[in-house]
């Protein structure tokens, strides 16, 4: 079974994200549980939590179908001790919010060395940040997203993801989300079925499908291997539709949230319908 949806707005409250997902006939969705561009957020009230859980029950969304995303400000590999601590506190808060909402996954970008420390040091800091957050929370899996490798962002090589996982003590609570645009921009080709076979074989060899907890299904405005993060609508960009059809037909991608972050929300319902048709249900 494929869970297919989009990253929907939580404007007006996190329960509104559930309603918006239902309106586009999504069987999965992503959301921010707080403003993604601010450090501080009001704690989740009992009323807000209850409304969210009631909406999920009403529209039949289980936690396995929901892939919340953390704040863009957080850098779990920050070279500066004070800034790193600020990010770690914020990440624990994000994990705690997921726990309160009954959510089992939290998707995040691994971090950036800001050209101030070595890659290996940054990756070790990210792993330690995850260990700290897992020790402070229960029931939520930290889901590392591959990046396009813009600037000094790490996570654009599968080896980076494997190194982080290697440093995480509780392997049962760490996973990976593959963003197709990021992978393509990071140098993993997806334009043909043979490309998909090779890229996902490489992923399985280096990281392992056992760690796959989600997908971001995005075409790319950016060129192959450009390390530029620019999403596009499915079939409109440089990846093309073949990869998305391939993913829909491959059972290795069953049972995880598959999230559109494509550039035109007006056609999300159409994109979801097409993906469902490719998955043949």
Swiss-Prot record:
Keywords: DNA damage, DNA repair, Endonuclease, Hydrolase, Metal-binding, Nuclease, Zinc. The keyword Hydrolase applies. Zn(2+) 3 binds at residues 182, 229, 231. Zn(2+) 1 binds at residues 69, 109, 145. Pfam families: AP_endonuc_2. CDD domains: AP2Ec. Its cofactor is Zn(2+). It comes from the Bacteria. Zn(2+) 2 binds at residues 145, 179, 216, 261. One of its GO terms (molecular function) is zinc ion binding. Binds 3 Zn(2+) ions. The keyword DNA repair applies. NCBIfam families: nfo (TIGR00587), PRK01060.1-4 (NF002199). Belongs to the AP endonuclease 2 family. HAMAP family: Nfo. This is Probable endonuclease 4. It comes from Pectobacterium atrosepticum (strain SCRI 1043 / ATCC BAA-672) (Erwinia carotovora subsp. atroseptica).
